[in-house]
């Protein structure tokens, strides 16, 4: 069987399980705000979906996104999820002979997009407690060359959950400007951070900000995101994007409603996921050989190290899956460091997080007896 078929069947089985507790994909499973639900049902009942939405997105949504990120002089291209935006950016702004610089670990798919464009990918290792599990200014300075076309930074980092300071972002932007590289700042998780700085503040001419509604608003299955950059860059990216006919209008109505209620609704979402983080840390401390790498995470997940417990991440994933709990093996993010950890999402009902915690000692014990697992994705 081809790998794409195996992968699809794997996720179809997970998706078709109504009892599954999703703690593996950083998705948000808290109840949707009533006004967001109403916006979607109103759009469906009005049968707006018969027509194509505006190609760059609803004007109201574009305005609200800019307000949310505080980049009033920028422009917005609404996309079918942040990942479509990343595909567009990597394929159009990179190319043969160019260097694409990113971190290891980080998010894997832009690496694939850059390679498909012909770029040479340079991954800078950051999985090291001695440097706080973060990219250093010296590392980036040493990695870039005159061939560097793109610097891609997930901030907060997925999977580690570290968030960069304003001084670090400013220094990274200066390095990008010096070599003439695009700074692709993937801010998918910035809403969860205590403090966050947009690279475009320092480098508006060649910064590209990636925005998502999947994680903070819980719209992963609706596929809605955005690219934010100066108007000249958006003009280039809007010329031939993967979708030229406008994004899902129902999704856009949900996003508009979400941004309007965000100030009143989201603080409690973040409080609840931080509560889940604290409970997971407490549970992990009670199991010999297990530890959380970064706490508090500035995103909605935790890296839980299991290498010193004498188990593989895959075995632990397999053990939990039998309990209808999905967590993610580290190799999804990084072949180099993935053998060390699993990732556990925290924007989930408290009962789900508690179920993970209560079962942890038994799952670790069970994982020690699991020597082989089926393919995981």
Predicted regions span which residues?
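N-terminal small-domain helix-loop-helix segment of the aminotransferase-like
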Residues: 1-84, 88, 366-367, 376-377
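PLP-dependent aminotransferase-like
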Residues: 92-153
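A short helix->loop->beta-strand "cap" motif at the edges of active sites that frequently abuts
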Residues: 98, 119, 178-181, 205
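Active-site phosphate-binding strand-loop segment of PLP-dependent enzymes
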Residues: 127-194
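Conserved core segment of the aminotransferase class I/II
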Residues: 205-274, 281-282, 318, 365, ...
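Conserved glycine-rich beta-strand-loop-beta hairpin in the small C-terminal domain of fold type I
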Residues: 273-281, 293-305
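Short, conserved charged micro-motifs
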Residues: 310-316, 351-355
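PLP-dependent enzyme catalytic core of the Aspartate aminotransferase-like
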Residues: 322-328, 333-377
